[in-house]
């Protein structure tokens, strides 16, 4: 169970990082 929570945390962190990077690049392109 602890392993599943850790894996889920890593997955959410990676998804959040990708989303922030995508939004940043898109904002730069709009400017």
UniProtKB/Swiss-Prot annotation:
Stated membrane topology is:
Single-pass membrane protein
InterPro entries the record matches: Cyt_b6/f_cplx_su6
Per the UniProt record, which residue ranges are transmembrane?
Answer: 5-25
Identify the keywords attached in UniProt to this record, alphabetized. Chloroplast, Electron transport, Membrane, Photosynthesis, Plastid, Thylakoid, Transmembrane, Transmembrane helix, Transport
Alphabetical GO CC annotations of the entry are: chloroplast thylakoid membrane; cytochrome b6f complex
Please give the biological process terms from Gene Ontology that the record holds.
photosynthesis
Localization of this protein:
Plastid, Chloroplast thylakoid membrane
Which molecular function GO terms apply here?
electron transporter, transferring electrons within cytochrome b6/f complex of photosystem II activity
Family, as annotated: Belongs to the PetL family.
Q: How does it assemble?
A: The 4 large subunits of the cytochrome b6-f complex are cytochrome b6, subunit IV (17 kDa polypeptide, PetD), cytochrome f and the Rieske protein, while the 4 small subunits are PetG, PetL, PetM and PetN. The complex functions as a dimer.
Chain's role = Component of the cytochrome b6-f complex, which mediates electron transfer between photosystem II (PSII) and photosystem I (PSI), cyclic electron flow around PSI, and state transitions. PetL is important for photoautotrophic growth as well as for electron transfer efficiency and stability of the cytochrome b6-f complex.
- Protein's recorded name: Cytochrome b6-f complex subunit 6
Source organism per UniProt: Chlorokybus atmophyticus (Soil alga)
């Amino acid at each position: 169970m602890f392993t599943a929570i850790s894996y889920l945390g890593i997955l959410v962190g990676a998804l959040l990082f990708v989303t922030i990077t995508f939004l940043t690049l898109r904002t730069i392109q709009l400017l």
